[in-house]
Design a protein with these regions (language model features):
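Phosphate/diphosphate ligand-binding glycine-rich loop within oxidoreductases
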Residues: 31, 50-128, 229
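Rossmann-like adenosine-cofactor binding region
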Residues: 47, 61-64, 165-259
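Rossmann-like dinucleotide-binding domain for NAD(H)/NADP(H)
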Residues: 95, 109, 207, 215-307
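N-terminal glycine-/charge-rich "phosphate-binding" loop or analogous flexible N-terminal tail
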Residues: 1-49, 157
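Phosphate-coordination loops involved in phosphoryl transfer and adenosine-cofactor binding
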Residues: 70, 131-134, 207, 216
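Structural motif
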Residues: 6-10, 34, 56, 222, ...
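Phosphate-binding beta-alpha-beta segment of Rossmann-like dinucleotide-binding domains, i.e.
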Residues: 91-153, 168, 294, 298-305
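NAD(P)-binding Rossmann-fold cofactor-contacting core
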Residues: 153-171
């Protein structure tokens, strides 16, 4: 069996070493395709692969058509909108993610962005503190829980909204559950976004919702750019000069945001949430173990597509 690690944005070496150890211990061959740049190289590499580990790499119908021997794709990370799930099901390919492995890294970055914003991008002027501020966590999954844990250390008042997470699960962590996204945004000084990009959530973070935030509101996005209605957020930030937007996902309209909202907007140059050695190791090794479990025992615990 051949396991391909296809990462245009490579894992840290220590993570690759851990993946190799898991794969070779199971008697499988590991092949690396790193910084490949051109899709043609990926199409060639997948031809004889039985399993693929990816990060943010795109696995679409064309890639699946080329991968005649493919049985499983594992996305090393939580989000999997870079994989065409319907096409994978049509090709009888199992798709998995590795939930929770990057959660602390993403949560820590969210706080890095928060501190940068409230200290006025470190421009030498007096900023404010996070202590005592109301933090809203939009989606209380693995990352959201880590954000809540860290927020306690900052002395913040913590609120959360998650349509799929029971109130008692949220409140057992000492977090106040609210009944709607509208209530969360109207209550909180800072909102940290952790919702996935789905048909229901795309463009859902819009003018009407963000405009509910109190004066001096700060929106932090370490989720997906697709959930932001960029045109409406630009309009709102033009009208409300008190709002700030910090994102780990560069918007399509990045140049417009940067030109119009200097001092109130920041984007990382590429998605950095999972860019730590620890997250690399955790997610990469989890992906390798899931592949071994699937190929040897048929384990589909973290399957995200239909059969």
């Amino acid at each position: 069996m051949k396991v391909l690690v296809a990462t245009d944005k490579p894992f840290a070496k220590v993570a690759v070493d851990g993946i190799r150890k898991e794969i070779e211990a199971a008697g499988y061959e590991l092949v690396l395709l790193e910084k490949y740049g051109e899709k043609a190289k990926l199409l060639e590499a997948v031809k004889d692969a039985n399993a693929i580990i990816i990060r943010s790499d795109i696995i679409d119908a064309e890639v699946l058509d080329a991968a005649k021997e493919l049985k499983i794709v594992v996305r090393a990370g939580a989000g999997y909108d870079n994989v065409d799930l319907e096409a994978a099901t049509a090709h009888n390919v199992c798709v998995m993610n590795t939930p929770g492995q990057n959660s602390n890294a993403v949560a820590e970055l969210a706080f890095g962005l928060m501190v940068m914003a409230v200290r006025n991008m470190y421009n030498g002027t007096s900023g404010t503190e996070l202590m005592g501020k109301k933090l809203g966590i939009h989606a209380y999954g693995n990352v959201g829980r880590n954000v809540a844990r860290i927020a306690k250390g900052f002395g913040m008042k913590i609120y959360a909204f998650d349509a799929f997470c029971p109130k008692e699960v949220i409140e057992k962590d000492g977090v106040k559950a609210v009944g709607s996204a509208e209530e969360l945004y109207s209550t909180c000084d800072v909102v940290s976004l952790h919702i996935p990009a789905t048909a229901e959530t795309k463009n859902s973070i819009n003018y009407a919702l963000v405009n509910k935030m109190p004066k001096g509101g700060l929106l932090v996005n370490t989720a997906r750019k697709e959930v932001i209605n960029e045109a409406e957020l630009i309009q709102l930030m033009e009208e409300r000069t008190d709002l700030k937007y910090m994102t780990d996902i560069m918007p399509a309209a990045n140049e417009t945001f940067a030109a119009k909202f200097a001092g109130r907007y920041f984007s990382t140059p590429k998605k950095m949430g999972a860019q730590t050695a620890e997250a690399n190791i955790n997610a990469g090794i989890a992906a390798a173990k899931q592949i071994v479990g699937f190929l040897k025992d048929g384990c589909e615990k973290f399957r995200v597509n239909k059969k």
